[in-house]
Structure formats: structure tokens, C-alpha cells
């Protein structure tokens, strides 16, 4: 995560940043192109210099190199100040073996860049309130929280095997977490809360899982370092219900990989449109991966009608979290709000 914002230090300060662009597949290049236009306007207005390096990943990399993420393309991303990605995948590549499909490139990119924290905001824009599936009385209280999900640990990255036992198949999936993995994602949760409304909810299943009990022990140690943050804990089943019943209670949710995968998808639905939802993946330092949560929309590719707002908001997140440019990020979000009006 970037260090705390200091308004006096940033006054009249211009920056030079190298951004690696992954245009992606199908309609995705159209949204990245629009996000770059917005970034260029910000650079022009504030005297920043953004330089762009193109990297290939996903379907376009398979077509060009026969590999969803060649080593040279990964290096372009690792050497950048940050990475802006559109969306990858599409029907053209669905018949490929699992390790050769576009999505494998994204997993390798996250791992190769050491990105262990996925941040996905859930925000209801007033102009789209009627599109939310929640009751008006719930929406009117406001929805503006972020799910901080551990990205490269837990059951998705544990041992997976199927064995024969007593004449039948038994499937086993292991859910490991080490203290240092929990501490680094927990710290990002607290730091994110410090930049928002200073409220953090750790979501787990500590009444059943040893991993969740370890999460709580580590989070309690971290809590001492952040006395300004109002810290609480919630079981994942209750959290899934509360996101629908009373989402206004949440500011920042931090949780493990599988729980975060499910809860962040649920959270994106209550906002009314996945076309408005950005995300970031962060690790040690300030370099991150920023992308919209929606897919590559192959059905409308080439028609210039795809909604670029989630990608534009992802660029705003990049300015805020990787480049320490909160004022510039605010300007982009205000512009989006004006367009919706």
C-alpha cells in the first residue's frame, strides 16, 4: 500500500509514472482506450507524465505467442509503476486445456507480481439506486464499502486430491494459512480503513475452522497498532446476510480467499451494475494491478457501445492507491458522477 497522503508535501508536486497496459480480449481494448484518454487529461491538467508500455496477456497473448502470459510480458508488468488491465477471455479460447486458457495468465500475473490483496469497492451511485435488487429503504441508507480479499492463499492454493477409500472416491481440499500471510492482508485491511471511515470487519468462520481462529489471533495483535479503527468480527454466513439486509454498516471487510471471492461477487450485485465496479490487486510496495470486474463482452465487441466506466474507475483507484494522487482520483470519480447525472 502507498504511504499516507500528506497534502502539504503533495502541493505543486508533479509525477512521472510508467503504466503497463493490458488491453485484453474482445471488447476490452475499447474500455482501456477510454481509460487512457482520461488519464491523459489528468496528466495534462496536473503536469504529470504518464508513459505507457503495452503487454500481452490472455487470449491476445495466446494468439500472438501461444502462451497466456509469456515471461517477457510478465517482466513488463513487474517493471511498471502499475498495471491497468481490461478483461480477458472469450468463446474463442474456451476449448483450450485449463493451463493454456486466458484465465491462467491472470493467475500467473498475480503470483508473478506478488499480489496478495484484492480490493473491490461496493458503492451505490445515487443515479443507479433503482437498479439495485435491494429495497429502497435499504439503499437509501447508503452502500459504500470495500472487500479486501486475500488472493494467493487458502483453499484455492492448498493441496487438492481425490483418492479411493472404502470403494468410493473421496475429494480433499486443504485450506492452509500461515501467520505472515494473515498479517500482511490484515495490515492492508487496517490501512484501507484508515483512509476511509476507520471501521474494519474481519469475516471468518471461527466457530468451525482452525484457520479462522488463527486469523482472529493475528488480527487481534494488529488491532493494537490501529487504535483509531473500530474493529469487529463476523461469521461469513451472517456477513452474506447482512450485505443484503444492512450494507450501510460496513466500511472495510477483510477476509480470506474463498470467502472474499463469494462476498465480493455478492457485494457487486447489490450496487445495481457490474459495469460500474472497479478493483485493485496489491502486494508489497505501491505497484498494483487495476481492472474492472466485468468480463470481455464478446457479444458487443467492435460496436463501440461497451461501458468503460468500471475501467475508468479502476484507473482512478490506481491514482489513489499506487500513485498517491487522491485529488486526481476524486476528480475522475466526480466526472463519472456528473456523466451519470
Regions found by a protein language model. Name each.
Residues 2-3:
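Short, low-complexity intrinsically disordered segments enriched in A/P/G/S/L with frequent Arg
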Residues 15-26, 53-55:
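Generic N-terminal amphipathic, Lys/Arg-enriched alpha-helix
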Residues 20-37, 41-43, 167-237, 249:
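Glycine-rich phosphate/diphosphate-binding loop of Rossmann-like nucleotide-binding domains
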Residues 25-28, 81, 148, 189, ...:
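Buried hydrophobic positions in well-ordered alpha/beta secondary-structure cores of metabolic enzymes
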Residues 45-71, 241-243:
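N-terminal beta-loop-helix "entrance" segment that forms/cooperates
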Residues 58, 127, 234-241:
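Short acidic loop-to-helix transition motifs that present clustered carboxylates
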Residues 59-62, 244-341:
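Glycine-rich phosphate/nucleotide-binding loop
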Amino acid at each position: 500500500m502507498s504511504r499516507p497522503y500528506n497534502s502539504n508535501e503533495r502541493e505543486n508536486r508533479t509525477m512521472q509514472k510508467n503504466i503497463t497496459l493490458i488491453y485484453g480480449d474482445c471488447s476490452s481494448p475499447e474500455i482501456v482506450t477510454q481509460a487512457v484518454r482520461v488519464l491523459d487529461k489528468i496528466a495534462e491538467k496536473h503536469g504529470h507524465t504518464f508513459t505507457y508500455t503495452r503487454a500481452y496477456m490472455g487470449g491476445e497473448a495466446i494468439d500472438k505467442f501461444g502462451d497466456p502470459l509469456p515471461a517477457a510480458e510478465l517482466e513488463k508488468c513487474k517493471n511498471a509503476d502499475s498495471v491497468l488491465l481490461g478483461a480477458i477471455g472469450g468463446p474463442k479460447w474456451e476449448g483450450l486445456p485449463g493451463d493454456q486458457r486466458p484465465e491462467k495468465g491472470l493467475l500467473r500475473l498475480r503470483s508473478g507480481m506478488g499480489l496478495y490483496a484484492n480490493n473491490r469497492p461496493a458503492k451505490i451511485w445515487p443515479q443507479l439506486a433503482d437498479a439495485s435488487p435491494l429495497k429502497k429503504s435499504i439503499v437509501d441508507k447508503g452502500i459504500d464499502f470495500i472487500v479486501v480479499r486475500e488472493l494467493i492463499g487458502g483453499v484455492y492454493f492448498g493441496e487438492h486430491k481425490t483418492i479411493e477409500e472404502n470403494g468410493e472416491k473421496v475429494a480433499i481440499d486443504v485450506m492452509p494459512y500461515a501467520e505472515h500471510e494473515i498479517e500482511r492482508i490484515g495490515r492492508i485491511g487496517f490501512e484501507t480503513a484508515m483512509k476511509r471511515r476507520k471501521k474494519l470487519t474481519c469475516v471468518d468462520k471461527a466457530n468451525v475452522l482452525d484457520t479462522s481462529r488463527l486469523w482472529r489471533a493475528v488480527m487481534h495483535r494488529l488491532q493494537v497498532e490501529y487504535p483509531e479503527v473500530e474493529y469487529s468480527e463476523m461469521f461469513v454466513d451472517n456477513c452474506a446476510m447482512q450485505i443484503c439486509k444492512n450494507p450501510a454498516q460496513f466500511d472495510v471487510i477483510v477476509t480470506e480467499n474463498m470467502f472474499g471471492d463469494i462476498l465480493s461477487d455478492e457485494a457487486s450485485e447489490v450496487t445495481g451494475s457490474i459495469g460500474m465496479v472497479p478493483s485493485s490487486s496489491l502486494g508489497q510496495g505501491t505497484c498494483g494491478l487495476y481492472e474492472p470486474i466485468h468480463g470481455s463482452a464478446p457479444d458487443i465487441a467492435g460496436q463501440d457501445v461497451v461501458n468503460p466506466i468500471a475501467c475508468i474507475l479502476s484507473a482512478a483507484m490506481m491514482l489513489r492507491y499506487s500513485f498517491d494522487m487522491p485529488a486526481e482520483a476524486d476528480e475522475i470519480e466526480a466526472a463519472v458522477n456528473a456523466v451519470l447525472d
